[in-house]
Amino acid sequence: MTRRREKAVQPVGTRRAAREFVFRVLFEADRGDLPLDTVFTRAEGAMREGDDTFPQLSADALTFANELVRGLEKHRADIDTTLRRTIRGWSFDQMAQTDLNVLRLATFELIYTAEPHPPVIESAVRIARKFGGDDSGRFVNGVLAGLSRSLQSAGVAKADEQADTAQD
């Protein structure tokens, strides 16, 4: 077996599997204009019945996937606003649905979770490459790297403001 092939059959990490599961749920919900929680419940049932459309998840991965879905539901409007500000020269209508949903999922994690940015971005790029077009991985990487930098700059600015306020 070649190195590339060995790498391809290695098990997917819990968080990455959960992200891929949620990506599929998000894609299906958007495509069918259905509530995210309804599609998640249906996907969870299909997974438990052995439907290979949705990857099998461990209990920990399913818990993480559920947290992602709840967060996406709660913060969807803010996530879309952030993406509209971040992506220059593209409207949501011009973007592939695959790319947009990968970006939504990763943007939620970058803004609303304590996950380190590099693994979130790496997972998003892998999902984009797996399900998107030829340039999806590069596009997603560029958008998320820019967003990560701006969030880190804003975090530094906020930390500086809090330190100045505390000294007063």
Curated annotation (Swiss-Prot):
Record Gene3D superfamilies? NusB-like
Listed A to Z, the keywords are: RNA-binding, Transcription, Transcription antitermination, Transcription regulation
NCBIfam families, per the entry: nusB
Stated name of the protein: Transcription antitermination protein NusB
Annotated signal peptide: none
Keyword Transcription regulation listed? The answer is: yes
Q: For this UniProt entry, what's an example GO CC term?
A: cytosol
Give a GO biological-process term: DNA-templated transcription termination
* Gene Ontology terms for molecular function: RNA binding
Positions of disulphide bridges: none
Q: What does this protein do?
A: Involved in transcription antitermination. Required for transcription of ribosomal RNA (rRNA) genes. Binds specifically to the boxA antiterminator sequence of the ribosomal RNA (rrn) operons.
User: What is stated as this protein's family in its record?
Assistant: Belongs to the NusB family.
